[in-house]
Amino acid sequence: MAQSNWEADKMLDVYIYDYLVKKKLHNTAKSFMTEGKVSPDPVAIDAPGGFLFEWWSVFWDIFIARTNEKHSEAAAAYIEAQQGKAKEQQMQIQQLQMMRQAQMQRRDPNHPSLGGPMNAIGSEGMIGQSNASALAAKMYEERMKQPNPMNSETSQPHLDARMALLKSATNHHGQIVQGNHQGGVSAALQQIQSRTQQPTEIKTEVNLGTSPRQLPVDPSTVYGQGILQSKPGMGSAGLNPGVSGLPLKGWPLTGIEQMRPGLGGPQVQKSFLQNQSQFQLSPQQQQHQMLAQVQAQGNMTNSPMYGGDMDPRRFTGLPRGNLNPKDGQQNANDGSIGSPMQSSSSKHISMPPVQQSSSQQQDHLLSQQSQQNNRKRKGPSSSGPANSTGTGNTVGPSNSQPSTPSTHTPVDGVAIAGNMHHVNSMPKGPMMYGSDGIGGLASSANQLLQDDMDQFGDVGALEDNVESFLSQDDGDGGSLFGTLKRNSSVHTETSKPFSFNEVSCIRKSASKVICCSFSYDGKLLASAGHDKKVFIWNMETLQVESTPEEHAHIITDVRFRPNSTQLATSSFDKTIKIWDASDPGYFLRTISGHAAPVMSIDFHPKKTELLCSCDSNNDIRFWDINASCVRAVKGASTQVRFQPRTGQFLAAASENTVSIFDIENNNKRVNIFKGHSSNVHSVCWSPNGELVASVSEDAVKLWSLSSGDCIHELSNSGNKFHSVVFHPSYPDLLVIGGYQAIELWNTMENKCMTVAGHECVISALAQSPSTGVVASASHDKSVKIWK
């Protein structure tokens, strides 16, 4: 229609008329056009069902998703995608702000602001000229008064003085405050450059080969991969003008070190790469931190490890730059690119607080800041009873011994900020507290010499300090998961409160779901049951494909082949079928030979051609999936599961016992776990393969493979148990499926919590160590994802 007819008050009439026409309601459309005086000009609306229909569909999906997310998974995914885009855009804006601040500092080197924007990701604003920054500025000015000649025949005392200057400038501003210290470090370095008359051109952008869209979307993590921002390097005496120690487009400059003729030792130029996403401190805490550093600096002035007495030979263990024989320029890279913590070549940064009395006051400040951060950061915490996010119900600590049944109270939802020591959330090894707070983790390229480390004593005490610093509570043991530790072999993300929440609900089955299984990379989830076909879910897009109903009866178990998209299904029709998830339209082969319904299957973790199955007649068969049955034994009628990683042992459930078979020793039965008073429904292995959990209606038992004893037991309190699996991130936590509810059992403290799960029996549980999620399948025809 003509442009003049597109007034705001006419738009709705135009859309309604277009909708009626495309719905072929021509008489109604004609009447509406006449009465509403709608323009007869053609409407340029590119929507097959009419713009009104398109608009209403999107509106309704979003509306119903916000009121009841179970009604529209597509809308919920749309909202989640929009939130992700918003976070991504925010990260780009923050990166832009930091780059702009760096440019402003380079344009105005005559007015450095040592108390400048030391803000977290540039969002906290200026913190002002505090007492700490004034003290730091004064000490910096005193050091700048020292002579620093430019000739190449510099004497050894002058070299020592330059190294002291390097260390003081590095450590005065080497705070653990999150963010890139644009004001402090950049201005200080530019002041050095102006006094030595060595303008250094630094590229603002340090590109690590990834686009801004690949930056982390959660800036609140304590140790996320941060945005690396370039800092002007220190122009050491003897370096040619314009030389930068920064990497070129993110790639480290090659080569090792250079020695200027006449110098008593190597000259080291560091590129200051800060991790944006380190410990978060408020502006007031930043001031306390800075003041503590200045005081600690004053106490350590006479230390042989600090200041002008620094032996230049201590730099020999550091990564070296490249010697250019043409102009003698040095390109040094400290190997800290991509490192999760700030690296430093200063030796004193590795001093543990337990050995240095001068940093006791700062440790006190750090402990206070840690407590303040925990109070701000964590959700509902519990030093005694555990709180839930959904209701006011609480669970108190259990006084029962680990070998006795524990009692528990249902709680709707879990978000416990207990004393969760995440074992490897901070790397262990030569990482220690220094007088500047948290020291850097020396990489393999710049580890300190072993003899320098000997004086620091046992590192074990330090690791305790790190864990207590990262803990979310006082560690009094009163919280539900007070001593729960994260699986160090899989998860290295930051310490955060434990939570177990439903993140997705999948409803595609028309009948009961009996089994589910993750692929080894966690990207696919297969579920099956009374539908006699397998539903295969893409965990990234939640798109689903299904196999045809090739089985004649219900499917009892489904398992993925290790490191493959192939999977196997067992059925009441006495057969096993092999499928490929990448092309599920038809099965690859059928394995026959059982004389009774096949109840369970499992692939060997290493010998991926080997498949084990059991039937209701207590027969266990081992198959070569490309050939036939290779051997058979008696001993399982419910479930079979190989020991993870090695596959040396097989756990087999039959009636009320669990048998352990040694696969590498002619399938010899090496142990029988007895103790259940009713039939065992499910078994699972701990991640390290040293424990076996078995579940029956009345109890869950945890068995030691080495001793054969039941070391922990949980009796039900009215909720009949049916399935069990170890939590993928916390190896001491068992996830138990019962009737409608999921039990979370901390085996170390023998405490339990109940989470509302499904509307019927939770028939199976699966977990993915790769993604840290748990899947639950139920007779209510749904599969839920938990994390």
UniProtKB/Swiss-Prot annotation:
Q: Does the keyword Signal apply?
A: no
What subunit structure does UniProt give?
Answer: Forms corepressor complexes with SLK1 and SLK2; LUH is the transcription repressor subunit and SLK1 and SLK2 the specific DNA-binding adapters. Interacts with SEU. Binds to YAB3, YAB5 and YAB1/FIL; these complexes promote adaxial cell identity in leaves as well as embryonic shoot apical meristem (SAM) initiation and postembryonic SAM maintenance.
**What's any one GO cellular component for it?**
nucleus
**Repressor in keyword set:** yes
Q: Name one GO biological process term.
A: regulation of DNA-templated transcription
Q: What is the tissue specificity? A: Expressed in roots, stems, leaves, seedlings, apex, flowers, siliques, flower organs and seeds (including seed coat).
The organism sits in which domain of life? Answer: Eukaryota
Q: What is its main location?
A: nucleus
Region of interest: Disordered: 299-413
LisH domain residues:
8-40
Give start-end ranges for the coiled-coil region(s).
Answer: 77-106
Q: Tell me the protein's name.
A: Transcriptional corepressor LEUNIG_HOMOLOG
Looking up InterPro entries in the UniProt record yields: G-protein_beta_WD-40_rep (IPR020472), LEUNIG-like (IPR044716), LisH (IPR006594), WD40/YVTN_repeat-like_dom_sf (IPR015943), WD40_repeat_CS (IPR019775), WD40_repeat_dom_sf (IPR036322), WD40_rpt (IPR001680)
Q: Which SMART domains match?
A: LisH, WD40
* UniProt biased composition (Polar residues): 380-409
Source organism: Arabidopsis thaliana (Mouse-ear cress)
- The record's WD repeats, renumbered to this chain, cover 508-547, 550-589, 593-633, 635-671, 675-715, 717-755, 757-787
Q: What induces it?
A: Induced by exposures to biotic stress (e.g. nematode and Botrytis cinerea) and abiotic stress (e.g. salt, genotoxic, wounding, drought and oxidative stress). Repressed by exposures to biotic stress (e.g. Agrobacterium tumefaciens) and abiotic stress (e.g. hypoxia, cycloheximide, 2,4-dichlorophenoxyacetic acid, AgNO(3) and aminoethoxyvinylglycine).
Disrupted-gene phenotype: Strong defects in seed mucilage extrusion; no mucilage capsule formation and slightly irregular columellae in seeds. Altered structure of mucilage that accumulates abnormal levels of substituted rhamnogalacturonan I and methyl-esterified homogalacturonan. Increased amount of most sugars associated with an increase in methylation of the mucilage and/or primary cell wall pectins. Reduced MUM2 expression in seed coat and embryo. Shorter roots. Enhanced tolerance to salt and osmotic stress conditions. In plants lacking both LUG and LUH, embryo lethality and abnormal flowers.
**Annotated spans, Required for SEU-binding:** 1-88
Query: Which keywords appear in this protein's UniProt record, sorted alphabetically?
Result: Activator, Coiled coil, Developmental protein, Differentiation, Flowering, Nucleus, Repeat, Repressor, Transcription, Transcription regulation, WD repeat
Q: Where is the composition biased (Low complexity)?
A: 336-346, 355-372
Q: What does this protein do?
A: Transcription repressor subunit of the SEU-SLK1 and SEU-SLK2 transcriptional corepressor of abiotic stress (e.g. salt and osmotic stress) response genes, by means of an epigenetic process involving histone modification (e.g. H3K9 and H3K14 acetylation), probably by recruiting HDAC, to facilitate the condensation of chromatin thus preventing transcription at the target genes. Can also act as a transcription activator. Implicated in embryo and floral development.
Select a single GO molecular function from the record's annotations and give it: transcription coactivator activity
